[in-house]
């Protein structure tokens, strides 16, 4: 990755970093062509702008349409980046069929990430060969490789840090201008580069896209429903300035476990409610969590309160914190707790889980106190989708949950 002199523990100076990094990139590439993998997020966009300062017309930005992005996102990103002051020419590569085929039938979160990574770099290799490029530039930042090295989860854009030689495996070398930076530093650098606020302050979106929010088996229908739910959640929560907010999707398959009754009793005790007003179910599909700084695959407990209790306890932070902590500590196989917001009896086979967190560095995160009225409105909108019968709100901080579900 090279030495970066301006990144210090106590401070970050965008102008110094930019000067050092552009000089490093010029020396490294020696006038050769470089492909930049752009997702539309702040990390890859800032990395591309840094590289353009150094490489000019030798930089070729592309965006891969994986089929796992938001509704109309590839076209919107291309159009927005082409505007002044960025004036970035972005080429779209359509490969949605390849990505969906690569994860078909796979339910394990880590295996899905690895298969996405393999397809992602295969597509990049093909594009690099077309342009006769030896280098691929990407927006890897420090939390990406820290989580991968720590065994918490595989980030698709982390290679060399985990012993994968991209030159040998894929036929090109990797450039990562931001690999020592954290999200707040990347945003500061973006502002220094006159990146419009819609990019510099944009909430993070994972490289594998909706893949890591589609819990369990991935199907075109689940992705379609998730795209619509994502649009509703992001539109509803954008005024609140939470660092990250999104929807995940899970099938309504529940574990037939005798401990479910005990989980319900634990939830009742934590909330100070009669057992008759609290009911818990445990989903079969597992999600990624963190315990003792290590990755674990845990279950999701869905907690349903009576209608009256839901209105009363819809957002009492202390009680919900006790609810989550009480269940996770007593049942080690559970890493997440979600509170039921809305349901339709006899509805479809899918549930949507809404997540919103507040964080500075994305290494830890607190649950954001979304007003109960807003959650109910989100639930009402999402329930118009006939395949969805339940909407939950995730009340799990990081740790023991990760921000993303897979």
Predicted feature residues:
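ATP/NTP-dependent adenylation/nucleotidyl-transfer catalytic domains that generate, transfer
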Residues: 2-406
């Amino acid at each position: 990755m090279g030495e970066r002199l301006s990144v210090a523990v106590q401070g970050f100076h965008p102008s110094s970093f930019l000067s050092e990094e552009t000089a490093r990139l010029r020396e490294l590439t020696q006038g050769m062509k470089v492909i930049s993998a752009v997702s539309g997020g702040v990390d890859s966009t800032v990395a591309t702008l840094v590289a353009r300062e150094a490489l000019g017309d030798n930089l070729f930005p592309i965006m891969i349409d994986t089929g796992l992005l938001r509704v109309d996102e590839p076209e919107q990103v291309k159009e927005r980046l082409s505007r002044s002051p960025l004036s970035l020419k972005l080429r779209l590569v359509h490969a949605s069929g390849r990505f969906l085929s690569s994860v078909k039938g796979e339910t394990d979160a880590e295996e899905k990430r690895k298969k996405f990574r393999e397809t992602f770099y295969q597509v990049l290799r093909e594009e690099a060969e077309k342009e006769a490029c030896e280098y691929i530039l990407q927006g890897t930042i420090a939390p990406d490789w820290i989580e991968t090295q720590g065994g918490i989860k595989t980030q698709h854009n982390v290679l060399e840090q985990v012993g994968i030689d991209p030159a040998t495996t894929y036929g090109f070398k990797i450039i990562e201008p931001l690999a020592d930076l954290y999200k707040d530093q990347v945003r500061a650098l973006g502002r220094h580069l006159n990146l419009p606020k819609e990019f510099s302050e944009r909430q993070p979106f994972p490289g594998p896209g909706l893949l890591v929010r589609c819990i369990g088996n991935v199907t075109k229908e689940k992705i379609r429903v998730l795209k619509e739910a994502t649009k509703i959640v992001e539109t509803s929560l954008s005024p609140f300035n939470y660092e990250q907010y999104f929807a995940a999707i899970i099938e309504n398959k529940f574990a037939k476990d005798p401990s479910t009754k005990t989980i319900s009793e634990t939830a009742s005790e934590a909330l100070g409610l009669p057992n008759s007003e609290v009911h818990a179910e445990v989903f079969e599909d597992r999600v990624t969590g963190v315990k003792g700084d290590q990755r674990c695959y845990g279950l999701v407990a869905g907690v349903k309160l009576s209608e009256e209790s839901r209105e009363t306890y819809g957002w009492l932070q202390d009680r919900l914190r006790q609810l989550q902590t009480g269940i996770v500590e007593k049942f080690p196989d559970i890493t997440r707790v979600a509170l039921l917001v809305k349901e339709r009896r006899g509805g479809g086979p899918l549930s949507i889980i809404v997540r919103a967190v507040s964080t500075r560095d994305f290494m830890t995160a607190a649950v954001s106190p979304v007003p109960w009225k807003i959650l109910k409105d989100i639930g009402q909108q999402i329930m118009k989708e006939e395949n969805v019968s339940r909407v939950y709100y995730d009340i799990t901080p990081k740790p023991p949950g990760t921000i993303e579900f897979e």
